[in-house]
């Protein structure tokens, strides 16, 4: 399954991860993954269901046609190219649709090829199993700028900062600061999709300047904000 929105921002949550997906990205969801899709703002969602027998087109770089299910066993966020965005509305999505004609089969094959070529984006946010830490993480996802310190967030769930720091390491393999940066990036991407200026995004997320925010983005994803936050027209 591929979920994407032509307008607005969606959030998809599986058992141990959540993804905030703006119109410039799509989310690949493998079979048998229970998930919940939440509309964060007015959004037009399109969902593509990929047949189990589907194969990517073969080419010089990949001479053997591969299955997307074999290549992508886990959820992943993909960049949406202008071509992919234009192709999707031409697929017949009506319930009980007739057998696709040759034109639709060609479009579907090209959609799969665009998905194969799409660059993955590190937008997944891991979620813990521990109930206290899960409650804290969900609160941060809902209000990422309410507090900045670990001490304040730990008090919110009635735990000591030391306990919360230990849980972040044992449950998520990262520090509180590293995990919160991923949340801020996801929310920044949603704000960029609404065409908000970089200075406004930086200020909203608690950064003293746009340059400080730019440095964080480069350090975290290895791309400048102009590239990472690029959205399809």
Language-model-detected regions and their locations in the chain:
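Compact structured core domains
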Residues: 42-127
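Short helix-to-turn junction characteristic of helix-turn-helix DNA-binding domains
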Residues: 91, 140-144, 188-195
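Short, Lys/Arg-enriched, Trp-marked, Pro/Gly-tolerant hinge/linker segments that flank
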Residues: 73-75, 95-160, 170-182
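Short hydrophobic/aromatic patch on the recognition helix
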Residues: 24, 164, 168, 212-213, ...
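Terminal helix-turn-helix DNA-binding modules in bacterial transcription factors
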Residues: 151, 170-214, 230-233
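N-terminal regulatory/effector-sensing and dimerization cores
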Residues: 1-74
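Residue-level signal for the short linker/turn that defines the boundary of a DNA-recognition helix
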Residues: 19, 146-148, 159, 174, ...
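Alpha-helical residues within the helix-turn-helix
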Residues: 155, 166, 170, 203-204, ...
């Amino acid at each position: 399954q591929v979920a994407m929105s032509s307008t607005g921002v969606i959030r998809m949550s599986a058992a141990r991860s959540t993804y905030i997906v703006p119109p410039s990205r799509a989310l690949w969801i493998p079979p048998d993954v229970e998930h919940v899709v939440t509309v964060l703002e007015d959004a037009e969602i399109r969902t593509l269901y990929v047949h189990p027998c589907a194969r990517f087109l073969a080419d010089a770089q990949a001479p053997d046609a591969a299955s997307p299910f074999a290549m992508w066993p886990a959820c992943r966020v993909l960049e949406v190219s202008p071509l992919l965005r234009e192709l999707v509305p031409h697929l017949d999505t009506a319930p009980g649709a007739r057998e696709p004609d040759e034109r639709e089969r060609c479009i579907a094959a090209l959609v799969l090829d665009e998905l194969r070529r799409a660059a993955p984006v590190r937008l997944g946010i891991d979620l813990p199993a521990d109930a206290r830490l899960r409650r804290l993480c969900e609160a941060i996802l809902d209000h990422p700028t309410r507090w900045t310190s670990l001490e304040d967030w730990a008090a919110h769930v009635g735990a000591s900062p030391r306990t919360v720091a230990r849980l972040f390491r044992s449950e998520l393999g990262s520090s509180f600061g590293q995990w919160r940066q991923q949340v801020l990036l996801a929310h920044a991407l949603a704000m960029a999709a609404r065409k908000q200026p970089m200075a406004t995004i930086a200020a909203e997320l608690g950064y003293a300047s746009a340059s400080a925010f730019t440095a964080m983005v480069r350090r975290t994803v290895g791309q400048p904000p102009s590239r990472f936050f690029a959205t399809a027209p």
